[in-house]
Structures are given as C-alpha cells and as structure tokens.
C-alpha cells in the first residue's frame, strides 16, 4: 500500500466519524481551532517559517472562502507549546493537533525518517532531495505507517538546504578535525566519526552559548540558521561540506483531529501542504546563497571543502551507510531497496553524487 493510499484510507475513516456526529454537533464541525507546534523558532528555519508564512494563512483563507467552515490556528513555535523533544508525543496525546518535528531528535521512534542523514553526499539541493525523498515516501508506505502507533497521520514535509560546518578555527583537511569537539544533532553525529572529530550531541537552541563557552569548537549546520542565530559572532569560519539536503521535518496530524475534519477541509489542507513543501525548498535555496554572503559580511570566512576532500569523506563513510541500510532490514523495512532507490531517483532528478554508494 502506498503512502498516498494510506492517507486516503485514514481520511475516509475520518469522514465516517464526521458524518456520524455532524447532525448533533454542527456548530462544532463548522469551526475548528487547531494547535500547530514546532520545537524550533520560525524565522531562522524554513521548515517552521513556512508553516507560519504559507501553510497557516493559506489554509485559513481557503477554508473560509471555499467551504462552510472556518479554521483558526493557534501557533506555537520555538517550544512555546512543545519543545524539540516533545512534539511527537504532544501530537500523539492531542496537546498538539498538528506537529512539525525534526526526526533527528527522535532517533528511535522516527528512525526511518532519518534516511537522508544515513546517505550523505548525494545532493545539497533541496529542490532535488525534497521531491526525491517524497517519492520514496510514496513508493515505500512504511514512512507513513510508522506514525500509526503514535496516533498520527503523516501529511508531508519539506527539505532543508545543504549541511556545512562552522568552526572557531580555520582548517582545510579532514585530518585537522581529529579530536576536535564538534556539535551535531542525532543522526548526523556519525558524520563526524569519519572526519576524525569528537562528536557532541546538541541542538540549535544551545549552540551559541556552547560555542562561546568552548563546550565544542564547531557545529554541523546549514548556513541560513548559522547566520540567523548569529553563530558567526563566536565561530568565524564556515565550510560548505556538501553533506547534503535532508527531508527530516515531518508534519503530522493527530488522528482524532484528522477524523473531525470534513473532507473539503482535508482536501485543502493536503493541497496546501504541497504548496508549503515547495515554499520550504524555495526558501532553502534562496537563503543558502544569501546566508553565505551575509556570513561574509558578518566577518565569517567562508570556503568550500573541495571535491577531493569531499570524495575522501564519502568513501570513508560508505561502510556506515551500509550499516544503516542493514538496520532498516533488521527492523523489518526494505533498507537496501530503499537506499538504492533513493540514489537512483536522486540521479534521475539531477543529482551528481561525489561518490555512488554500493549497498550490499
């Protein structure tokens, strides 16, 4: 069963529930207050920013204009309703109706959604990796059904721009990172093992102080939040690594909430999720270039890793990529087929990987 069919079946079940209650709760059915939450703040991060700028206003306007219903969103970003580690559980419990969560902070429960972290160096373009990964989600329905046990319906997500490395010191060869403490979040921590660095688990909300105080001397991050959070004030060097764009910020709806929404509201919501996804990736591309320029203006030294060093790192990490594919298999998911199909689709969509992994 494809992810799309899974969504349709869940929606159909929801319509039956709405029909059963419509005659007695018409006033309730006409007006919906929906709590939407993300652990990160909006402005620096496209995946959250476009909830506020695109999804919420578009759904609100269209529901009012095209249906007999109204929708009012109660927005809670930056941990005001649920923090980075609480969004999945809060959506499951119904504290949140619509949750946007980084799967990087759910390495066990949302293991499968960290697919792009497990296959670095394919492409740093979110306009390639976003559509590619969403097609993978369509072809392999376990990306949707994994949310069943958490009482949620997966409705999509947009891809980040390319990951890079900000440091407090200049460097050119990966050997220079040996033993250096570098912060990263969850599934991208192992990238540092193959660069020889000493990894430190962290999150965006604590990076500035950690860099400033010397808890670590570098951070794995894309340039837009590096500039937006002003990390360049305390770490003056940024290297474009080419680790890749990732789709790892799934948006879900609590199943009870989804069941209460009429079919015309659901239709609008799913259509506007498509618009949201494109907006996230458009913002990512735009901010990637502008953020690098802004970092230079901020006094940060910006450089590219270079194809030779990038190729060395990709080759070194290949055994780990195979290990992750095997972990999917061990959990009952077709990891080898998924990883191979991801690389195949990415190339069809325009990716030129620095190294093509052999998944055994």
Where are these regions (language model features)?
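Bacterial N-terminal signal peptides that target proteins for export
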Residues: 1-14
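Sec/Tat signal peptide C-region and signal peptidase I cleavage site
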Residues: 21-29
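N-terminal secretory/targeting leader peptides
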Residues: 28-128, 145-360
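Absolute N-terminal positional cue centered near the fourth residue
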Residues: 4-5, 19, 32
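Signature of the catalytic double-stranded beta-helix
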Residues: 128-143
């Amino acid at each position: 069963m494809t992810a799309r069919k899974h969504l349709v079946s869940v929606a159909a079940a929801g319509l039956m529930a709405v029909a059963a209650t419509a005659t007695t709760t018409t006033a309730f059915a006409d007006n919906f207050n929906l709590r939407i939450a993300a652990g990160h703040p909006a402005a620096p991060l496209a995946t959250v920013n476009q909830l506020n700028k695109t999804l919420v206003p578009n759904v609100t306007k269209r529901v009012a204009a095209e249906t007999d219903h109204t929708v009012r969103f109660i927005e809670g970003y930056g941990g005001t309703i649920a923090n980075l580690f609480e969004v999945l559980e809060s959506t499951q419990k119904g504290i949140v109706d619509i949750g946007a969560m980084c799967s990087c902070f759910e390495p066990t429960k949302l293991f499968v959604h960290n697919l792009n972290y497990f296959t670095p160096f394919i492409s740093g373009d979110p306009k390639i990796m976003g559509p590619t990964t969403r097609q993978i989600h369509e072809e392999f329905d376990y990306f949707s059904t994994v949310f069943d046990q958490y009482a949620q319906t997966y409705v999509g997500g947009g891809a980040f721009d390319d990951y890079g490395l900000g440091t407090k010191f200049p460097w050119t060869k990966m050997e220079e990172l040996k033993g250096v403490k570098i912060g990263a979040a969850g599934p991208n921590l192992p990238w540092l093992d193959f660069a020889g660095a000493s990894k430190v688990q962290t999150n965006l909300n604590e990076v500035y102080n950690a860099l400033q105080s010397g808890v670590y001397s570098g951070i794995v991050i894309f340039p837009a939040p590096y500039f937006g959070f002003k990390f360049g004030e305390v770490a003056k060097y940024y290297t474009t690594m080419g680790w890749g764009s990732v789709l790892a910020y799934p948006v879900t709806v609590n199943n009870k909430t989804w069941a209460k929404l009429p079919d015309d509201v659901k239709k609008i919501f799913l259509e506007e999720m498509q618009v949201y996804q494109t907006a996230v990736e458009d913002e990512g591309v735009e901010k990637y270039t502008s953020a690098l320029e802004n970092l230079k203006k901020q006094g940060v030294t910006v450089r590219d890793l270079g194809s030779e060093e990038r190729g060395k790192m990709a080759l070194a990490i290949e055994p780990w990529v195979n290990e992750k594919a095997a972990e999917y298999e061990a959990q009952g998911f077709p990891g080898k087929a998924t990883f191979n199909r991801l690389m195949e689709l990415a190339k069809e969509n325009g990716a030129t990987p620095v190294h093509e992994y052999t998944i055994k």
